[in-house]
Regions:
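Intrinsically disordered, low-complexity, repeat-rich regions
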Residues: 1-157
Length: 157
């Protein structure tokens, strides 16, 4: 597992250019999102090390720019696998937020939307707290507020 600073030095110029072109971003914006995506992957790979098995981490619409970039990176399977081996201590699988995480489910949404909202708010608070504790206030604000405001066309609904 490499330190965050080393992970942030990873370059994939072809991916940055392709992402900028596909999503009509400036190179500077694509590079900024790429750096945040690297931080996001490092965070996911490093959470709970030595304490419990890795488990899903909830994502919210605000993380859509990071998630979309991750999807694009995964498509370059060799580069992604090499990156994971070198910087994350092994392959980081991409899994959707698990159905039933902390009781959240589509069925609950249909039957008790208020309870579903309360669970989602609790999950969001826990996620933001964990990111703040591990990555700092600036990163937490970027991931949960600024990136999706800056790139609304990348926010999934």
């Amino acid at each position: 597992m490499s330190p965050l600073a080393s992970t942030l030095n990873f370059k994939h110029d072809a991916l940055v250019r392709a992402f900028a072109k596909k999503y009509k971003l400036s190179m500077a914006s694509s590079e900024e999102l790429f750096a945040h995506m690297l931080q996001w992957l490092w965070f996911l790979a490093n959470r709970n090390l030595g304490h419990q098995p890795r488990h899903g981490f909830p994502t919210f619409p605000a993380q859509a720019p990071l998630d979309i970039y991750w999807h694009e990176f995964i498509l370059d399977t060799r580069a992604y696998q090499d990156f994971c081996s070198t910087h994350l201590g092994g392959f980081l699988h991409h899994c959707p937020t698990p159905e039933g995480l902390e009781g959240a489910s589509h069925e609950l949404f249909l039957n008790n939307p208020q309870q579903q909202r309360e669970i989602n708010q609790m999950l969001l608070k826990k996620a933001m707290y964990e990111v703040h504790a591990k990555m700092g206030l600036e990163t937490m604000l970027s991931w949960y507020l600024h990136l999706h405001q800056k790139h609304p066309h990348l926010v999934q609904t």
